[in-house]
């Protein structure tokens, strides 16, 4: 049995990650705003991929390709920017992570009688889609699966509607939660599927089912999500191409820069090879159009929009493009703090505390075209980005060990419960 386990782990380890041969990751620290600004041109110059951006209060982590490492180090040393090695061999670290995932899979296989659940491990897209179909078939009185569209590569973009009144009661507020806009943020989809589980399979808050209508979209970006399992673990964007010949080499757009609110004005890129490429136009991506259409279809009753990202233990609200505050800033902050407080009371002690605030001010940089800002701009009163927790600013921040997935799902659900009830109170006033 032990021999078979070793063979299984080896098969996982050597199956992928060749794209990251020779890559390293670095901790990067900045002491001044000028140093933070000096990093910006290096992103394009050296094709840097920041897993987390540095601020004056915390280090960031950046991935660097082998051909750029010497130049990158030389430039940041010249600018007085501090750095240290985070992972000397990114490929080897990813192989170790794969072992943890496979061990978790084997452990849960026995616990769940062979059934793969989308919230007890980092599961492939097919497992998530099968779960949605299972819920729709087993609970047809309250759950309806919607195949909203096909992704660029032809995969279904599925979401589930949960309602005791078939979405026909105009007095019920609508809660919309999505995940997986950024393909590599693997903790995001489980947090959404756990919410489905709690609303349908393991109901402990009956009022949430009776008094609200729910829309839950676990994977906005199925093409990108699938690609992170088969090719590049740190892929972030969609997988589309366009008339620009460069897009055949550098595919996709950043879904969270593709929404039509001050689109492509700041914190984005016009280069298809950039991880923050805003696309050829607002809503150029079918994936973001699905989110847009859901928001507009139910806008009159849309009381709360949550988009799940990672990482950082943050609850963020508009406006992210310039750091200004919404007219509803007090309400946004009050509800955000209430959600964060209950999450914190249910969190493990080794998880960092949640921070609540304006997106740009908390994360330390501006972005245009986000789903959070767009939803608020069209009239959704409470619109938030959840940056789900990690164990550190390093590897275990971005790639949370799989044994912590269910814990994150549980505590995040408690925040959703509070947010929904607060949103319902405001909706009914």
Curated annotation (Swiss-Prot):
Residues at the catalytic site: 387 (proton donor/acceptor)
Keywords: Carboxypeptidase, Disulfide bond, Hydrolase, Metal-binding, Metalloprotease, Protease, Secreted, Signal, Zinc
Regulation: Highly resistant to inhibition by potato carboxypeptidase inhibitor (PCI). Moderately inhibited by leech carboxypeptidase inhibitor (LCI) and tick carboxypeptidase inhibitor (TCI).
Signal peptide interval: 1-15
InterPro entries: M14A-like_propep, M14A_act_pep, Peptidase_M14
Compartments it resides in: Secreted
Protein name: Carboxypeptidase B
Gene giving rise to this polypeptide: CPB
